Amino acid sequence: MKGELLCVLLLCGVAFTLPDQGIHRRFRRGARSYRATCRDEQTQTTYQQHQSWLRPMLRGNRVEYCRCNSGLAQCHSVPVRSCSEPRCFNGGTCQQALYFSDFVCQCPDGFVGKRCDIDTRATCFEGQGITYRGTWSTAENGAECINWNSSALSQKPYSARRPNAIKLGLGNHNYCRNPDRDVKPWCYVFKAGKYTTEFCSTPACPKGPTEDCYVGKGVTYRGTHSFTTSKASCLPWNSMILIGKTYTAWRANSQALGLGRHNYCRNPDGDAKPWCHVMKDRKLTWEYCDMSPCSTCGLRQYKQPQFRIKGGLFTDITSHPWQAAIFVKNKRSPGERFLCGGVLISSCWVLSAAHCFVERFPPHHLKVVLGRTYRVVPGEEEQTFEIEKYIVHKEFDDDTYDNDIALLQLRSDSSQCAQESSSVGTACLPDPDVQLPDWTECELSGYGKHEASSPFFSDRLKEAHVRLYPSSRCTSQHLFNKTITSNMLCAGDTRTGGNQDVHDACQGDSGGPLVCMIDKRMTLLGIISWGLGCGQKDVPGIYTKVTNYLNWIQDNMKQ
């Protein structure tokens, strides 16, 4: 008996001391759920485990039925028919599954969402932002907004579970909205251990004296412009001549579309731009209005950097949407290499540094990439362009780097090249007489090296914060007798501390932007040109002074 007892005890000891070979326990760290989710990029919607949905196929009059399974969308095609009632906004086409009641909207360009209710081109809000339906999702404190459909918001007064959620712009997304007619768009964020509201950092649209510009396609335009491209006067939307037309003041949703007892330009059907009905040669027709898009230069969805590195901070392209990456084909081997940075200043034009092009590359060997956070990893919203031509300043001095500026024209089959998005946007050009106080803090960005001795460029976009030096400190005697001209400006990190903490540009950042906040817009003051090493304490970087080249830029863009 004692022997048997001893054997049992020994076996128990082995059981308690041997490692668990068959069971691999996973311990949760933090409060994050392990329940998988799926995100449908076509509708910008997130689905939970085992949830199903419909989405349009790329070709044919069919749609796909999808189901979220362990984080993967499993889809197959199903037949559909036209919906019995309109359910899609902004000109979307509604299709309903043949054998069950779910529906799907095929959205026109620029709109996404279950009901085509999200405007991907809306980069700012008008008025209080009550009608804002864009994709901004960052609060003023830099926090990411919570999805309106989150179960954590089910007891909040405004969530995607309200009966009138669609009307208020709420849904299965985390984009800023203003459902309660507050002063500007807001959202819920997780702060100090609880869910609370925060105003969003969404920029307000510029207010011109007549508001004769429009944002995106002008779907939300509510100004008073009333003339077409042929200078014809618009007909009132309640004119008896329009009886029988699709878009009039008598539509059930006319107020939501901006139609009424007036003749102001509107875009009720999500066309390319605002339009109106006119009489031409005694015939009723329509024409686009004589209007231009509002300038959205210098606006961005800034996200607070999370990782500090030598020379600056890792950042996201949405914080610097004007940043361009320029690549050139290798001479003796297939592939391409990163060349320099650049700055998008209009849809088809990028500024850079002249010294990047001293080898006189053929234009067809160059490529510009916009919207990329990681230098060599394609981004979800990136845009790539070949180069039509590039212009290097005729008086560029390769020894002193005086007139270190170049202009690249992007190639496109239309008059528009870069499409504006949260990842792609233009930096503002400054007024010729702009004067900023000495030591104004500005930002630079690029994919350059972390330090001069590094053999590699940065894998990810970086940003650095520097201050504008006074002209009295931007001289040859302060920079080891290097030539400094009136076409250059100096900027550097003035904080105390060792060299490892100094923000600065470095090799590979050349051609990139030095931008400063002017009237709440990031404005291009300098182009990264040259420096003495990288990140040296009390040694500023040298930038091409953009205000000296405004006429040169405009003249070359007109050619």
From Swiss-Prot:
Residues 124-205, 213-294 form the Kringle domain. Residues 39-49 are annotated as: Important for binding to annexin A2. PROSITE patterns: EGF_1, EGF_2, EGF_3, FN1_1, FN1_2, KRINGLE_1, KRINGLE_2, TRYPSIN_DOM. One of its GO terms (biological process) is trans-synaptic signaling by BDNF, modulating synaptic transmission. InterPro entries: EGF-like_dom (IPR000742), Fibronectin_type1 (IPR000083), Kringle (IPR000001), Kringle-like (IPR013806), Kringle_CS (IPR018056), Kringle_sf (IPR038178), Peptidase_S1_PA (IPR009003), Peptidase_S1_PA_chymotrypsin (IPR043504). The record marks 462, 509 as: Important for single-chain activity. Residues 1-17 form the signal peptide. Keywords: Cleavage on pair of basic residues, Disulfide bond, EGF-like domain, Glycoprotein, Hydrolase, Kringle, Plasminogen activation, Protease, Repeat, Secreted, Serine protease, Signal, Zymogen. It is an enzyme of class 3 (hydrolase). One of its GO terms (cellular component) is cytoplasm. Belongs to the peptidase S1 family. This is Tissue-type plasminogen activator. It comes from Rattus norvegicus.
